[in-house]
Amino acid sequence: MSSQEASKMLRTYNIAWWGNNYYDVNELGHISVCPDPDVPEARVDLAELVKAREAQGQRLPALFCFPQILQHRLRSINAAFKRARESYGYNGDYFLVYPIKVNQHRRVIESLIHSGEPLGLEAGSKAELMAVLAHAGMTRSVIVCNGYKDREYIRLALVGEKMGHKVYLVIEKMSEIAIVLEEAERLNVVPRLGVRARLASQGSGKWQSSGGEKSKFGLAATQVLQLVEILRAAGHLESLQLLHFHLGSQMANIRDIATGVRESARFYVELHKLGVNIQCFDVGGGLGVDYEGTRSQSDCSVNYGLNEYANNIIWAIGDACEENGLPHPTVITESGRAVTAHHTVLVSNIIGVERNEYTEATPPAEDAARPLQSMWETWLEMHETGNRRSLREWLHDSQMDLHDIHIGYSSGTFNLQERAWAEQLYLNMCHEVQKQLDPSNRAHRPIIDELQERMADKIYVNFSLFQSMPDAWGIDQLFPVMPLEGLNKSPERRAVLLDITCDSDGAIDHYVDGDGIATTMPMPEYDPENPPMLGFFMVGAYQEILGNMHNLFGDTEAVDVFVFPDGSVEVELSDEGDTVADMLQYVQLDPNTLLTQFRDQVKNTGLDDALQQQFLEEFEAGLYGYTYLEDE
């Protein structure tokens, strides 16, 4: 692939920015993965890897997970805060506390724990706390307990403290403190407490309601004062050691982060004035990732990098401490998305393509009705004059005629052949107009976008949007999507991607397209009979755990991929994926009962025994097969 072609492809899909040096296009026009950019020789051709796995029986769709990316993300964030602390003379420590709600899979938690980097864990429920406590012996670090808490949750956290772990119970509701003090006395343990302050500062974007005065969690200023007095009266003021706030997930604008940290730093100062020895400053989540690669303030991008993020936090806290003569606290961030998003790619196969093809135009019958004649006259005029200023007018005239023909068809004025002729001529018109439009002409941009959407290939992909990318459906989250191969060809086609659920919402509506977002996906020319595999990137945060079972499509298979400098690759199956039986059991449909009921029906058909046996074997094989489409 020439450098010019490679450059164009990188710009089209913006992979140079959202790929973050983990993903690239190689000289064959294939996606390559480098799990550790500090070791550039350790990389793998993803297209070839998937083909090799398929030859060994790998089913698609499947998640290809790269634990080494997780570890590199953790090292990168820790390094950014180390540089910031050194740059500003900050004396406090820093810990990244991983909120396991982002991805609770064992492979994620243990890959991070075994990275050799300092790491804490955060839980937001009883189940998560049990997972965290069980792994706490591997980290000997910090545990932060957030979320709503009942007596059992609080007892579990205090048991962890009694066992020698640093467990911070963050008070988010005033009702929690009485239970904490009661259970601490019962267990004879000094609780280690935090308080979540509800800030006036609020970020922007899809998760802005996580912060601000109307946020679901946290204590208002009055309640913070009440908490201090309750603890003082109980003789437990020294237990309050951590200050926590949260502006929201995926903060796009660094100014919002800086504003929130400055406000929360005032809480740190004021609490010290009240005699509260706050030792840890937990700024929560918010560190975003650039799904678009546009480096902007849009909801799916960020206008800052790791160094700027760390610098703003360390400077704001350090400045408040210096101004008021206070010690530098340990800084904690709960940066789950930034750690996990990049490490997982969903790979799937295309199962069908529907194209709007150009065909040779033929005139209507001489006695054809006026709308048909009008469409043909417009077609001839466009070919005879070639006047670009009339392109929009010609397209609009054809649209009006086609609209009249559709109405006439419903009333019986036009027959099926006439409707088909009109629709095909309109497609031809769109093809011709599209060829003559100039993307550099701003006046042409709206009509180019309209035609790209109208003429795009419909590509049916073997996956469930609701299971594998629920945020794309639920909140219009954008995820980068690319073919894994054929990227040494110019992206001449446009496409929309549709899943295999029986739901019209099962479609991807937005795609990365250069420095912007489009409603269609750029695609290189491809053979519809042998289409490329597709990769859905940056799905490592939230998607696996939020995925739902629409149409009873289950978890996909998942593999962990390890890449080494000598070019060797190790692949481990980490999740076999759900069978049909698994999904049926989840909705209380027992597979054995279903098989018995089906067997009884087959017996009553009167078919010969061999055919009955064939039907039973096919039903049973389906029960214990993959929930997604499989080739014979």
From Swiss-Prot:
PANTHER family: ARGININE DECARBOXYLASE (PTHR43295), BIOSYNTHETIC ARGININE DECARBOXYLASE (PTHR43295:SF9). It comes from the Bacteria. Pfam families: Arg_decarb_HB (PF17810), Arg_decarbox_C (PF17944), Orn_Arg_deC_N (PF02784). Keywords: Decarboxylase, Lyase, Magnesium, Metal-binding, Polyamine biosynthesis, Putrescine biosynthesis, Pyridoxal phosphate, Spermidine biosynthesis. The modification N6-(pyridoxal phosphate)lysine is found at residue 101. Catalyzes the biosynthesis of agmatine from arginine. This is Biosynthetic arginine decarboxylase. Substrate binds at residues 281-291. Its EC number is 4.1.1.19. The keyword Magnesium applies. One of its GO terms (biological process) is arginine catabolic process.
